Curated annotation (Swiss-Prot):
Keywords: Cytoplasm, Developmental protein, Nucleus. It comes from the Eukaryota. This is Protein mab-21-like 2. Required for several aspects of embryonic development including normal development of the eye.
């Protein structure tokens, strides 16, 4: 048994140093190329409208606010200033979303975003995005990369196609630090020792983002009043939880396997599903020794089996917001074929670790 485990870990480490590192290097090169174009577009936006200041900065070879959706798809979060005059209201009526309401006694005129406040005093995510979309469309025509960048039509999101190969979504957002959403109040679960109290305090201080994008639960109902709501995102908190042990290596292997074998019609699976299931695996195996290099094969196997289970039940709860189902709106047939394909992949890796050479 131990010999089989060691063989799998050896093959996974080989897979990591060959396939995963090559994927990382290719993505890093793409990011540099894409960020040049996006920075130029955002510089042009800022000239027209100084309230939208580009926050895309490179720190230690990482771009703050940039998320890799897939090797050809990225999301850039554009942090907005001055959320202060609004109260964060998160009553759970819209899973995964919250609203920003003008604080009592505050005048609209005190807000930097006065014309985007609705009659009932809410700061409308949709109105801000609509204005931003207009500005980006104008900037694309003026910027120095106008020959290689186009705006993607037929969506309320701000999406660019770059060199006909890459898609970048630019999402206006507010950073919320020092508060924690009521809809995530159940975290951390009291009977689970992971993460420890110090890490929990760090994560809660890190806070979350409020994004101006289509709500998961409202896709296709854009005209409703609820489209004024903001989407909760916990990227920094999640990244902080995945520090230490073989967690980030495990995520890298999962992403690479997904990109190469689980990019299926109907797009049932993305890398965020992999990250979510890795967080649940951390809860199931709370001791740091469970995340030693020697356990990489066991942890990967556990996550793939959990993924199959989620696909078969057609439900994948968000890690911090369990009322939000990350499979919502995905075609059942796509989830079914993803379950079959994941099962084939897991069986192959477990019964014949050498097959990783070909995967």
């Amino acid at each position: 048994m131990i010999a089989a485990q060691a063989k799998l870990v050896y093959q996974l480490n080989k897979y990591y140093s060959e396939r995963c590192q090559a994927r990382k290097a290719a993505i890093a090169k793409t990011i540099r190329e894409v960020c040049k174009v996006v920075s130029d577009v955002l510089k042009e936006v800022e000239v027209q409208e100084p309230r939208f200041i580009s926050s895309l900065t490179e720190i230690d070879a990482r771009y703050e606010g940039l998320e890799v959706v897939s090797p050809t798809e990225f999301e850039v979060v554009l942090y907005l200033n001055q959320m202060g005059v609004f109260n964060f209201v998160d009553d759970g009526s819209l899973p995964g979303c919250a609203v920003l309401k003008l604080s009592d006694g505050r005048k609209r005129s005190m807000s930097l975003w006065v014309e985007f406040i609705t009659a009932s005093g809410y700061l409308s995510a949709r109105k801000i995005r609509s204005r931003f979309q207009t500005l980006v469309a104008q900037a694309v025509d003026k910027c120095s990369y106008r020959d290689v960048v186009k705006m993607i039509a037929d969506t309320s999101e701000v999406k660019l196609r770059i060199r006909e190969r890459y898609i970048v979504q630019i999402t206006p957002a507010f950073k919320c630090t020092g508060i924690w959403p009521r809809s995530a109040a159940q975290w951390p679960l009291p009977h689970i020792p992971w993460p420890g109290p110090n890490r929990v305090a760090e994560v809660k201080a890190e806070g979350f983002n409020l994004l101006s994008k289509e709500c998961y639960s409202l896709t296709g109902k854009q005209s409703s009043a609820e489209s004024d709501a903001w989407v909760l995102q916990f990227a920094e908190a999640e990244n902080r939880l995945l520090l230490g042990g073989c967690r980030s290596k495990c995520l890298s292997v999962l992403k690479t396997l997904r990109d190469r074998h689980l990019e299926l019609p109907g797009q049932p699976l993305n890398n965020y599903h992999m990250k979510t299931l890795l967080l649940y695996e951390c809860e199931k195996h709370p001791r740091e020794t469970d995340w030693d290099e020697a356990c990489l094969g066991d942890r990967l196997n556990g996550i793939l089996l959990q993924l199959i289970s989620c696909l078969q039940c057609r439900r994948c709860p968000h890690y911090f917001l369990p009322n939000l189902d990350l499979f919502q709106g995905k075609p059942h047939s796509a989830l079914e074929s993803a379950a079959k394909q994941t099962w084939r992949l897991a069986r192959e890796i477990l019964t014949n670790p050498k097959s990783l050479d070909k995967l």
